[in-house]
Amino acid sequence: MEMPMPPDDQELRNVIDKLAQFVARNGPEFEKMTMEKQKDNPKFSFLFGGEFYSYYKCKLALEQQQLICKQQAPELEPTSAMPPLPQPPLAPTASLTPAQGTPSMDELIQQSQWSLQQQEQHLLALRQEQVTTAVAHAVEQQMQKLLEETQLDMSEFDNLLQPIIDTCTKDAISAGKNWMFSNAKSPPHCELMAGHLRNRITADGAHFELRLHLIYLINDVLHHCQRKQARELLAALQKVVVPIYCTSFLAVEEDKQQKIARLLQLWEKNGYFDDSIIQQLQSPALGLGQYQATLINEYSSVVQPVQLAFQQQIQSLKTQHEEFVSSLAQQQQQQQQQQQQQPQPQPQPQIQLPQMEADVKATPPPPAPPPASAPAPTIPPTTQPDDNKPPIQMPGSSEYDTSAGVQDPAAAGPRGPGPHEQIPPNKPPWFDQPHPVAPWGQQQPPEQPPYPHHQGGPPHCPPWNNSHEGMWGEQRGDPGWNGQRDAPWNNQPDPNWNNQFEGPWNNQHEPPPWGGAQREPPFRMQRPPHFRGPFPPHQQHPQFNQPPHPHNFNRFPPRFMQDDFPPRHPFERPPYPHRFDYPQGDFPADMGPPHHHPGHRMPHPGINEHPPWAGPQHPDFGPPPHGFNGQPPHMRRQGPPHINHDDPSLVPNVPYFDLPAGLMAPLVKLEDHEYKPLDPKDIRLPPPMPPSERLLAAVEAFYSPPSHDRPRNSEGWEQNGLYEFFRAKMRARRRKGQEKRNSGPSRSRSRSKSRGRSSSRSSSRSSKSSRSSSRSHSRSRSRSSSRSRSRSRSRSRSSRSRSRSRSRSRSKSYSPGRRRRSRSRSPTPPSAAGLGSNSAPPIPDSRLGEENKGHQMLVKMGWSGSGGLGAKEQGIQDPIKGGDVRDKWDQYKGVGVALDDPYENYRRNKSYSFIARMKARDEFSTFGTRKEEKED
């Protein structure tokens, strides 16, 4: 294949040459990055199949060949200084393999294939843009043609549409509708008006109110079209209703979509459109796509030339790719023929093309290293030319070395190069091999696995090498929580970390960040600590008889992005199922644990802060109780410990409003569902204790990423995180209600029995007292008994009034206590006034806000919204308060009438006295007539 002609523009040629050099050095990733950054730059059109694409590809192939020669030239220099060696009677050796990282022919073909796909996608996107532009231009030309035919003044139509957009009043909609019906003289007139509405609604800068108000206008026009049988205008609106509705529906959020969806239900109910249009409106995305396809078919004369031009361009790119592949195949054939014609023991210094992957696979593996105790032999006859090359020490390879001694660099010469030592010294800057790998096509098993627990090779993540400096960036604190060396938990043995990982809080020399009376900032870690997660199977679980690492769980959940935290080690087991224990023992045992997502993330760095009960770092908290760590592990896993309320070390020394809110949780019973005041004296601090497996599982589940089984809500919290708790809460509440209903009849029976007993006792007492009393007393008593009988309404009529009143007061003695209990509720402290303050809550502003419908209507009618009501703001400013309780004769008086009028009060008092006099006169007259009758 001949070299294509370079561009005449020297600047463009320099750009192509420089880019070919950079891509040859840095690999195809650099080309991808350049294509993404320069996709809109016309100078880089050769990357997307432009005019000089073939010149760029040939230049790139030449640069890659030159890079291969430069990389292999230093490897041939030691062979020229060596004496000639006798040729063994063996088969001719294969030519020198290309250096690792140099693209082979297959890679070049794949790179060209990927480039072809990218260019094709880019051309398809450009084709779509040009087709859309061509269709829009054709539609605009059609509108201009209709405008010339009808001679309608569309500016007058716009003047009528503007009030509809601004206020959407009935008068504005009626004016727009009347103008449309008065100008709907012919089908072109109707198409022009409908097309104008479509252009206004589907414009890119149209806001939601504009679209919604104009759709209201269309709805009114459709209604009158059906009433007046205006078929031409109805047919014109049917053509444009799909893009109008679908564009407006897809451009807004869900709450605004409901307003538009109501119109669709109305249209479907009234039968304005046929079934095909209704189906397109019910699925807006599909309907909009069908409408665009209809436009392409309608304006095919404009669209076909654009599509044909792009198809030709894509076909030319495919042809160039096929020519490039055939050229590489021909060069490979020529190279193989040259190798068969000129067999030589040593490779030639000049290699024109990269080797095939098959040649790389045919090269024999490097010889195995001899034992270290054997002396270094002299150069054997079959020694390869690059055996004397000094080994390249790779960074990070020492991490996998399990031997205690240091390798002798002099012993590496006769041993031969390792699999990671075949890297040329002048490797390109983009080539970086962090781990030792074998050459292409060779699967060389390791002589001895670096880890005794893994026979298949080293794990993906290197060990920490007994140091946490590189991960955390600063030292950790002392093993004690509060800096006390003589604490009862400091004399216990360290956990077993299998000699690979050091204890996370051992061998420290600086004061702990959570100790002392002053808090220090948390650790500045680049990634979360791995010791908090589950342990790999080749390690033993640490003994949890050490003081726990302090945490602070009073934090918001982190950002739920997968990039924030590294993936978990592949050998680590999944976390424990997060099932939580309830102190009342009402855990839903029939519900299994939720599924856990395998790609969970590690705990957040902010979790390393201290809890408020972690020793004397806060001067107001008491010290941890002695011997808290003496429980065996199987006792610790049984659930929450029993808190001794008499322990003085658990009583907080600060006000209750300075304590964490979580300390209220033990005081609220599971069956409680109504407000009950809590006594601050009952609050106790949790005793210090090692974290249980359930607690660790809960923390792990809290910081794990969202999954299908555990979705998140809009604020980032787990959707069903408290499902088990709410389920247990509802069960306890239901059980309590059932018990209350079951115990209801028995309680009423006991009350009636006690009521009967008390009445019998009181009746016996009253009978005894009545015998010893005089007649006058009994008369007065009987008079009082008649009054009390009318008041008490007791069931028993055999006993006297005093006994009835006594028995009633005794049997009903529970009601005042209930009232007293309800009055003794502690009021909830106001949140606005702040905790511990006695100031009254602020008086809320009684004026109506802008979200009030009445406020909005008054603004539309010309009210400024700042002063009183009315155009001149002469009315009241504050809204009318709610009506107070009035007397019967005042309840029909209007708003603003003074109820404390002195004249009205005087008149009312006089009426009271007049009525009293009239009643007294009537009584006196009736008494006099009775007396006269008796005398007679």
Swiss-Prot record:
Localization per Swiss-Prot or TrEMBL: Cytoplasm; Cytoplasm, Perinuclear region; Endoplasmic reticulum
CC annotations in GO: cytoplasm; endoplasmic reticulum; perinuclear region of cytoplasm
Residue spans of biased composition, Low complexity class: 330-355, 488-500, 551-560, 759-773
Record-listed cross-link Glycyl lysine isopeptide (Lys-Gly) (interchain with G-Cter in SUMO2), residues: 853, 881
N-acetylmethionine PTM positions: 1
Record field: transmembrane: none
Keyword Hydrolase tagged: no
Keywords, comma-separated and alphabetical: Acetylation, Cytoplasm, Endoplasmic reticulum, Isopeptide bond, Phosphoprotein, Ubl conjugation
Amino acid composition bias (Basic and acidic residues), ranges on this chain: 561-572
Compositionally biased intervals (Pro residues): 81-91, 363-383, 534-550
InterPro entries in alphabetical order: CID_dom, DUF7819, ENTH_VHS, G_patch_dom, Surp, SWAP/Surp_sf
Limits of the G-patch domain: 850-900
Residues found modified as Phosphoserine: 822, 824, 826, 837, 864, 866, 913
A Pfam short name: G-patch
The SURP motif repeat ranges on this chain: 15-57
Functional description taken from the UniProt entry: Involved in calcium homeostasis, growth and proliferation.
Protein name as it appears in the record: Calcium homeostasis endoplasmic reticulum protein
Source organism of this protein record: Mus musculus
Gene expressing this chain: Cherp
